[in-house]
From Swiss-Prot:
Signal peptide: none annotated. The keyword RNA-binding does not apply. It comes from the Eukaryota. The lineage of its organism: Eukaryota, Fungi, Fungi incertae sedis, Microsporidia, Nosematidae. It is found in: Cytoplasm. Belongs to the class-I aminoacyl-tRNA synthetase family. Its EC number is 6.1.1.5. It comes from Vairimorpha ceranae (strain BRL01) (Microsporidian parasite). This is Probable isoleucine--tRNA ligase, cytoplasmic. Gene3D superfamilies: HUPs, Isoleucyl-tRNA Synthetase, Domain 1. GO terms for molecular function: aminoacyl-tRNA deacylase activity; ATP binding; isoleucine-tRNA ligase activity.
Length: 1046
């Protein structure tokens, strides 16, 4: 593959994709690594019902970078793709397609037909996914992908569940859960917290008259609610026994609430009466606003009870309790012995969020639509109505507001294992680190029992067969066991294939419970189920159990025998939302099964938002098409843009197309230019001569190599792009520019080696151009011809060489400083500087002096002198010391004392500190705690001061300066003319100009071939190039002739 300057970035990536496919590079790489130590990676399965977006591309890029990098370090990395197939995303799309709004319509249609519809769209966009993943340069195994709907996966989910059941973690109960009326199912706590929106709602303060007098007054208790639709289900009022409550009077009526909240709900004049503790109210009965459930009064309902969750900063300090619709309410009723855990309470709302016949006034009305009707009905009992704006949870799938509702559910007992979860979390390396103890750690510390059952249809059925009274429960652990128990051949575990199976136990008839698993449970089983643990996968429809010999009380032997090689994962990576999703379920299941974490290292990425800061939306069209971005700027540029941003450290990214363009401009194009320079310099070979900056560029490259390795070994991706920019700048704008003539003459050995290694280092990040660069380099070496396939992605990471030195950095700093002075004082680079003096310590000047000729040439200087400060008495240097708070804040106890010491330092003391590190032993302050600024003043010429050196510039103009300026201007004119003619570097020309002065002066400084004639040659050849050079008010005709035309 030869370098072709006519190819665009998109052409190159298309060419490389074809090369990979034609040579089966990915497959070959796996073959080459099959006997190496394994590095385990889990790929979180996406849904193929939607198209891939920038969030998927980000996560996929992070995974690809890490796995390619680990491959380079002698690891075997299985990169197996997976598909999430079950759950609400699929069902909701089918419901929309078929116009289904209630669960009864599914039952009438038939579960078999409904699930067949679901299955038909599961892989709807799989081809688009594969196409996008390949275009972004990710290597992953699609051919051997797992699907959560396959029998081999589902039977393994059953086995995992059966182990949890045997360990006593599974139970059935009632709980107030987040409930989606749009999808007619419960949601997990993490799902419920994933989609909050600001909404306007009506809030009301309702009067609840006490049945008996309080302080000889007929008093109404005032309770506040933002959900008026729950008032028909009121069962109690809750106060805090330690709060002070106030009786107050308005228009001869008496009310009770917190005194500090009265003004928030009342603007009339009030008369204050008794102030007392909430404990006095506990046990008092009141009249409920509706009479639907009056029969519960004999059970102790419709009384005031105590609860610690009551707030003194919002509402009235008195909570209207509807235990069927509030978790705190339900728990408070349990704590007050009004009900037992898992008891039923009035719950007159169905799965569609509509009132049932128990609340006959509002039967069939959707709860949120009933708010205004209820307020109107209770107008005589409403103390006040206010509209409020507040955050409210919405269903992440249907976008309808959630309600909290008492439901029957199956739970995995997690709360008893919080200490284990936290202990295992300590083993995990989180990137960024604060996720461990903040977002994820706090979630773990408040872990609740996991309601894992869902009242849906398209999912893995929960393998529990129960008697009508639940006195007998049988947990089936595999498809094979179900075959033995039922005598029926099992080819599919979806409910339509197994729900007709009736089993018996102890003389009782058992039927399967109707629920399916929360699809998060399936995802959490992925480490085991993708390998069909503990079964051997035969095909997608049949499994054979692998027999294990292990004690019933010790399942660890199964773990040791079967999944030790693949568990825990060395690495996983997904978005920040997965701290409550996949990361959490992986961690819970592995902890409960094996008391081990499921993964060792995890990178948590943030969210990619539109440029305006809003969520990316197809409807709003507020983001570009990823495929167009990749086609325009290249997938490599998109990859590097994403992983070099804070989004790989759990921050959000406002996606900007210009950011991708900048990466192309700063990385790919300079790299391409260096490659082009190399390939066009190969016509001659002269590798014997050692170049002045060879040691420096080798040192710089090894620093780059080591820095990338250090960051990547710590899973810190964001710094790599900046390191690549810096190295390419050093290579292109320093090494190549300074040595361009020598390299053009064939001295390319160092450049070849560096480009080849650079291609290998960059291959995980920019896989396309790395491959192109590598292949171009291989083809440039005639002795490297081979029929075998070779790819940059087969190469191991280069080892750092202990070679080179960094002394040119001092010269570089000097050159940059002189350029800064030129810019500041608007002195053209074409104007030579008469003299430059460098003042510094002896070591600095010794290193810089090695490169005097380079400094002179790069800065266009006549005379460069290195002098001591004492040799320039007119120079005045002032030193100033400031506290460095970045380091001082690490020890807050001593910070103030150290600041006082730093502020008292004298000029001589600061000067000593600038050159000698005596700070800690002499002043009790570390040098790193002090920032030293140097200010220099010089009476004549230009002056620049840094902490390392001072530069004095004599910029006076004399004849020598003017001559060199003219020569440089004329040489620059000739080079531009050559470029406009399209001449190659090795094309030699003769120059004709009608000015002896220009000829003589230019020849002093530049090797230009002038015509021997004293004037313009006539007639002018048709192939000659003509232009005009302006000099001293004259327009001089200049002719350029290729030697072959003369």
């Amino acid at each position: 593959m030869k370098f072709d300057s006519n190819l665009s970035i998109n052409d190159i990536e298309t060419k490389i994709l074809k090369f990979w496919k034609d040579t089966k590079c990915f497959k070959k790489s796996n073959e080459l690594s099959k006997n190496k130590k394994k590095y385990t990676f889990y790929d979180g399965p996406p849904f193929a019902t939607g198209l891939p977006h920038f969030g998927h591309i980000l996560a996929g890029t992070v995974k690809d970078v890490i796995t390619r990098y680990q491959y380079q370090h002698n690891k075997r990395v299985d990169r197996r793709f997976g598909w999430d197939c079950h759950g609400l995303p699929v069902e909701f799309e089918i419901d929309k397609n078929l116009g289904i709004s209630v669960k009864q319509e599914i039952l009438e249609m038939g579960i078999d037909k409904y699930n067949a519809e679901c299955k038909s769209i599961v892989m709807k966009h799989s081809s688009e996914w594969k196409d996008t993943v390949e275009k972004m340069g990710r290597w992953v195994d699609f051919d051997n992908s797992y699907k959560t709907m396959d029998l081999s996966f589902m039977t393994s989910v059953w086995y995992v569940f059966s182990q949890l059941y045997k360990k006593g973690y599974v139970y059935r109960g009632y709980r107030v859960m987040p409930f989606s009326t749009g999808c007619m199912t419960t949601l997990s706590s993490s799902e419920a917290k994933s989609n909050y929106k600001m909404v306007n709602d009506l809030s009301v303060v309702v009067e609840f008259p006490l049945k008996s007098k309080l302080f000889d007054k007929k008093v109404s208790i005032l309770a506040w609610t933002t959900t008026p639709w729950t008032l028909p289900s009121n069962c109690g009022l809750v106060v805090n026994k330690d709060f002070d409550y106030q009786i107050f009077e308005i228009d001869h009526k008496f009310y009770c609430m917190l005194p500090n909240r009265i003004q928030d709900f009342n603007k009339k004049e009030v008369i204050l009466h008794e102030l007392f503790k909430g404990e006095l109210l506990i046990g008092l009965e009141y009249e409920q606003p509706f009479n639907y459930f009056e029969e519960y009064r004999r059970c102790g309902f419709f009384k005031i009870i105590g609860g610690s969750f009551v707030s003194s900063t919002d509402g009235t300090g008195i909570v209207h309790a509807a235990p069927a619709f509030g978790e705190d309410d339900y728990n408070c009723f349990v704590e007050n012995n009004l009900i037992k855990q898992n008891d039923l309470v009035p719950c007159p709302v169905d799965e569609n969020g509509k009132f049932t016949a128990e609340v006959f006034d509002y039967k069939g009305i959707y709860v949120k639509d009933a708010d205004k009707l209820i307020i109107k009905h209770l107008k005589e009992k409403i103390f006040c109505v206010k509209q409020i704006s507040h955050n409210y949870p919405f269903c992440w799938r249907s976008e309808k507001p959630l309600i909290y509702r008492l439901v029957s559910s199956w739970f995995i007992k997690v709360s008893d294992s919080v200490d284990k979860l936290i202990k295992n979390n300590e083993i995990i390396n989180w990137v960024p680190k604060d996720i461990k103890h903040k977002k994820f750690g706090k979630w773990l510390s408040n872990a609740k029992d996991w309601a894992f059952s869902r009242s849906r249809f398209w999912g893995t059925p929960i393998p529990l067969w129960v008697s009508d009274d639940y006195s007998e429960i049988l947990c089936v652990e595999s498809a094979e066991e179900l075959e033995k128990l039922s005598g029926k051949k099992i080819t599919d575990l979806h409910m339509e294939f197994i729900d007709d199976i009736i089993l018996t136990k102890n003389g009782k008839t058992l039927r399967r419970i109707p629920e399916v698993f929360d699809c998060w449970f399936e995802s959490g089983c992925m480490p085991y189920a993708q390998h069909s643990w503990p079964f051997r996968k035969v095909d997608n429809l049949n499994c054979e159990e692998i027999r294990h010999h292990f004690h019933d009380s010790d399942n660890t032997l199964v773990y040791e025998n079967k999944i030790l090689e693949n568990f825990p994962a060395d690495f996983i990576g997904e978005g920040i939302d997965q701290t409550r999703g996949w990361f959490y379920t992986l961690h819970v299941i592995s902890t409960l099964l094996f008391d081990k974490p499921a993964f060792k290292n995890v990178i948590v990425n943030g969210i990619v938002l539109a440029e305006n800061g809003k969520k990316m939306s197809k409807k709003d069209k507020n983001y570009p098409d990823p495929n167009i971005v990749m086609k325009t700027f290249g997938a490599d540029s998109l990859r590097m843009y994403l992983i070099s941003s804070p989004v790989v450290e759990a921050d959000n990214l406002l996606f900007k197309e210009d950011g991708v363009k900048d990466v192309s401009k700063l990385l790919i194009i300079p790299w391409m230019n260096v490659l082009k320079f190399y390939t066009t310099s190969l016509q001659k070979r002269n590798d014997c001569e050692k170049l002045e900056l060879d040691n420096w560029i080798n040192y710089t490259f090894n620093e780059f190599l080591s820095s990338v390795s250090n960051y990547m070994n710590n899973y810190q991706l964001s710094k790599v792009c900046g390191l690549a920019y810096k190295f390419l700048d050093n290579l292109s704008n320093w090494y190549l520019r300074i040595h361009r003539e020598e390299i053009r003459s064939g001295n390319t050995k160092i450049l070849f080696n560096i480009l080849k290694k650079f291609s290998v280092i960059m291959s995980p990040f920019a896989p396309f151009f790395s491959e192109y660069s590598f292949q171009c380099l291989l083809s440039s070496q005639q002795n490297e011809k081979s029929n075998s396939i070779n790819s940059v992605h087969f190469q191991m990471y280069p080892e750092a060489q202990d070679s080179g030195d960094n002394s040119f950095e001092n010269a570089k700093d000097i050159i940059d400083a002189i350029r800064y002075l030129r810019d500041k004082h608007t002195i053209s680079l074409k104007t030579p500087l008469k003299e430059v003096k460098i003042i510094s310590d002896e070591l600095f000047m010794k290193d810089a002096a090695k490169f005097s000729n380079t400094i002179i040439r790069e800065c266009h200087v006549f005379n460069l002198i290195f002098v001591k400060e004492s040799e320039v008495p007119e120079l005045k240097i002032e030193y100033k010391a400031k506290p460095c708070f970045e380091y001082l804040k690490k020890d807050l106890k001593t910070m103030n004392d150290k600041i006082k010491i730093i502020n008292k330092l004298t000029q001589s003391e600061i000067r000593d500190l600038a050159f000698l590190d005596l700070s800690e032993e002499k002043y009790n302050v570390k040098r790193e705690n002090i920032l030293i600024e140097k200010k220099a003043t010089f009476p004549t010429g230009l002056c620049f001061a840094s902490n390392k050196f001072v530069i004095l510039v004599d910029n006076t103009i004399d004849d020598n300066v003017l001559e060199k300026k003219l020569a440089r201007e004329f040489n620059s004119f000739i080079q531009k003319l050559r470029k406009s003619c399209g001449l190659k570097m090795n094309d030699t020309v003769n120059v004709e100009v009608d000015s002896e002065k220009i000829k003589q002066i230019t020849k002093k400084f530049y090797p230009i071939n002038f015509s021997t004639e004293g004037q313009i040659v006539s007639p002018i050849d048709s192939d000659a190039q003509i232009d005009v050079f302006s000099y001293e008010g004259q327009e001089l005709k200049v002719i350029l002739r290729l030697n072959k035309f003369l």
